[in-house]
From Swiss-Prot:
It is an enzyme of class 6 (ligase). It catalyses: NAD(+) + (deoxyribonucleotide)n-3'-hydroxyl + 5'-phospho-(deoxyribonucleotide)m = (deoxyribonucleotide)n+m + AMP + beta-nicotinamide D-nucleotide. SMART domains: BRCT, HhH1, LIGANc. The keyword Hydrolase does not apply. Gene3D superfamilies: 5' to 3' exonuclease, C-terminal subdomain, 6.20.10.30, BRCT domain, DNA ligase/mRNA capping enzyme, Helix hairpin bin, Nucleic acid-binding proteins. GO terms for cellular component: cytosol. The lineage of its organism: Bacteria, Bacillati, Bacillota, Clostridia, Thermoanaerobacterales. The gene is ligA. InterPro entries: BRCT_dom, BRCT_dom_sf, DisA/LigA_HHH, DNA_ligase, DNA_ligase_AS, DNA_ligase_CS, DNAligase_adenylation, DNAligase_N. This is DNA ligase. HAMAP family: DNA_ligase_A. PANTHER family: CHROMOSOME TRANSMISSION FIDELITY FACTOR 18 (PTHR23389), DNA LIGASE (PTHR23389:SF9). GO terms for biological process: DNA repair; DNA replication. One of its GO terms (molecular function) is DNA binding. Its cofactor is Mg(2+); Mn(2+).
């Protein structure tokens, strides 16, 4: 492909990927299969690898990249990001409405009523249609510049969709973590023995303040845009018009925004969302009222802290009393024992709550929770049931203090509590409960993502002794699957196909799937990038592991202990024999990989590789592709009809390899 053809194709791919990103992340209406989308992205990555000069800051491939930063820079907002005054009841709303109408000499007023998202306020600055800066609200006048982290949020456009955008525009929105993503994040953190986030807002805030954008990208954040802070080239008459324009430009604007002209309509809307809010996939803690006409907003003005033309109505937090009927123990995939309170069913925040995790023995003792206690509960972030504390004044004397068992409730093995940790663990690596949850973890969405292998199927496979470890999944037959309940021939074929397709998963997914204690998705990716293969990771010593950024002594110990066990090494060997991918599927970290330090030049036309594909394969293994031959070049890969690079390589005595030898080089490296 000629350079001008590559440039045109790269721009075509960017536009196509942006279109599908908008359909998926903003409109929630995809029109393309995941596999086809992935193919487009891979083609663009390959082109930009082969032609680095084609990479642009707003390319979809540049959402996550660069080294972790050392800190955050403070920047000034073009217009202050003021906080909103609060209203907590009907009287407060009536006072606000009266002040507005008095300030406008009883003119007609329309209110835009928006959901009040419980997240992190940010500003996004676009210059000539391209995202150049993102910042937190901070103190309203200045905030922290977090552009690399905000770029990882797929629903934030890197460039505006419609032509004619102003030279400079600063828009405002609320970054949030969806309920499902929050629940999964805390589950993974609990499994890995990490502190839990109290609510989605804290999780979103912590994710945005990561020095490494790669961590932010893994947290599944999203955003709703709610206004324009500054623009130098476009004028709106109403706030609702500005919201419509933002939607046309590709931003996510919440569909539940409404316009009302009377306070009675507003109050009915507030009552509707008092219960309906719990059905949303994200957390809201109230609604926001804004005067719609911008000329009226200007006349009403602002105080030092907040605009006079807007107010935030906040719902009171929901709490309930119930009784602890029992405390049971759950054994996780790493062997950690998690106590769970069985509660008398009670209605709370839109659902019936009957259980709440107590996390560990220390927390039970700290909150003085006993079996039979009356306790006060709420939902952390309107999602996760949490016991706030007991009500000692309501005790009858029949309550029973809880004591952690000394043996595993599943296999009767001895329990251990590692020094310096709050968790208690089953010492038996073959514990049935650990095995079941290890399998469920292995096939989960963030691990090997094998559709159709849910809890019911896993349980049957274990009961019939068809699997004893994750590697056995790859030897299942059609006959064995058809013999399971509710698995017909078609379902069996689909399941076998999903299992076979999962063999091509990345090395990072494989490492995460193994369930190594303290090794989450982020650590798995870092280890995959550093060592390039599962064999390389297994051979690594303590110093090599701790030399990886963010991999401290705790994770290093876990990795060493995991691969020191004969049983785990046998599982890995079975996975290799089954054909599971065990090498890095992405460029190795700088200075690592089998081709680390090797420089390649490509010349001529290859039969089985495009130039972009060959470059990508070299980069995946840690090598480097350059355009000019020099004495520092290690290999010149020779295709048909080579140019002057071949002559220069001969003159300089550089090692020249033809396509068959190049293929042998790649296959030899990837077979270890």
């Amino acid at each position: 492909m000629k350079p001008e053809e590559a440039r045109a194709r790269a721009e075509e791919l960017r536009r196509e990927i942006e279109y599908h990103d908008h359909r998926y992340y903003v409109l929630d209406d995809p029109v393309i299969e995941d596999a086809e989308y992935d193919r487009l992205v891979r083609e663009l990555v390959a082109l930009e690898t082969a032609y680095p000069e084609l990479v642009t800051p707003d390319s979809p491939t540049q959402r996550v990249g660069g080294r972790p930063r050392e800190g955050f820079v403070t920047v000034q907002h073009r217009a202050p990001m003021l906080s909103l005054a609060n209203a907590f009841n009907a009287a407060d709303l009536a006072d606000f409405d009266r002040r507005v109408r008095t300030g406008l000499a009883d003119e007609d007023v329309d209110y835009v009523v928006e959901l009040k998202f419980d997240g992190v306020a940010v500003s996004l600055t676009y210059e000539h249609g391209r995202l150049v800066r993102g910042a937190t609200r901070g103190d309203g006048v200045t905030g922290e510049e977090i552009t690399p982290n905000l770029r990882t949020i797929r629903s934030i456009p890197l460039r505006l969709r419609q032509p004619g955008a102003p030279n400079v525009i600063e828009v405002r929105g609320e970054v949030y973590m969806p309920k499902e993503a929050f629940a999964r994040l805390n589950e993974r953190r609990e499994d890995a023995g990490l502190p839990l986030f109290a609510n989605p807002r804290n999780a979103a805030a912590g994710s945005l303040r990561q020095l490494d954008p790669g961590i932010t990208a893994e947290r599944k954040l999203d955003i709703w845009l709610y206004g324009i802070g500054y623009t130098d080239g476009i004028v709106f008459g109403r706030h609702s018009e500005a919201l419509a324009w933002l939607g046309e430009q590709g931003f996510r604007v919440n569909p539940h925004t409404r316009i009302f002209s009377t306070l009675e309509e507003v109050e009915r809307h507030l009552e509707h969302w008092r219960e309906a809010r719990f059905e949303l996939p994200y957390v809201i803690d109230g609604l926001v009222l804004k005067v719609d006409r911008l000329d009226q907003q200007e006349r009403l003005g602002t105080t030092l802290k907040s605009p006079r033309w807007a107010v935030a109505y906040k719902y009171p937090p929901e709490q309930a009393e119930t009784t602890v009927e029992d405390i049971i123990i759950r054994v996780g995939r790493t062997g950690v024992l998690t106590p769970t309170a069985v509660l008398s069913p009670v209605r709370l925040a839109g659902t019936t709550v009957s259980r709440a995790s107590l996390h560990n023995e220390d927390l039970i003792r700290e909150k003085d929770i006993r079996i039979g206690d009356v306790v006060l509960i709420h939902k952390a972030g309107d999602i996760i049931p949490e016991i706030l504390g007991s009500r000692p004044e309501k005790r009858t004397g029949r309550e029973t203090p809880f004591a952690m068992p000394v043996q595993c409730p599943e296999c009767a093995s001895l329990l251990v509590r590692p020094e310096g940790e709050v968790g208690v663990y089953c010492s038996n690596v073959a514990c049935p409960a650990r095995l079941e949850r290890s399998l469920l973890h292995f096939v989960s969405r963030n691990a090997f993502a094998i559709n159709g292998l849910g809890p019911a199927v896993i349980q049957q496979l274990l009961e019939r002794r068809l699997v004893a470890d994750p590697a056995d999944l790859f030897t299942l037959t059609r006959e064995e699957l058809v013999g399971l309940e509710r698995i017909g021939p078609k379902s069996a074929d689909n399941l076998l196909k999903a299992i076979q397709n999962s063999k091509r998963n990345s090395l990072a997914r494989l490492i995460f799937s193994l369930g190594i204690r303290h090794v989450g998705e982020r650590a798995a990716r870092l280890l995959a990038e550093r060592f390039g293969s599962l064999a390389g990771l297994m051979a690594a010593g303590r110093e090599e592991l701790e030399a990886v950024p963010e991999i401290g002594p705790k994770i290093a110990d876990s990795v060493l202990n995991f691969f020191a066990r004969e049983q785990n090494r046998r599982v890995v060997a079975k996975l290799v024999r089954a054909g599971v991918n065990t090498v890095a599927d992405r460029p190795a970290a700088a200075g690592t990989g089998p081709l680390a330090g090797k420089t390649f030049v490509l010349t001529g036309t290859l039969e089985e590789f495009s130039r972009a594909e060959a470059a990508a394969r070299i980069e995946e293994l840690g090598g480097r592709v350059v355009s000019n031959v020099s004495r520092r070049t290690d290999y010149v890969v020779l295709g048909k009809n080579p140019g002057g690079k071949y002559d220069k390589a001969v003159k300089l005595g550089v090692n020249i390899i033809e396509e068959p030898e190049f293929k042998r080089l790649l296959s030899g490296i990837q077979s270890y």
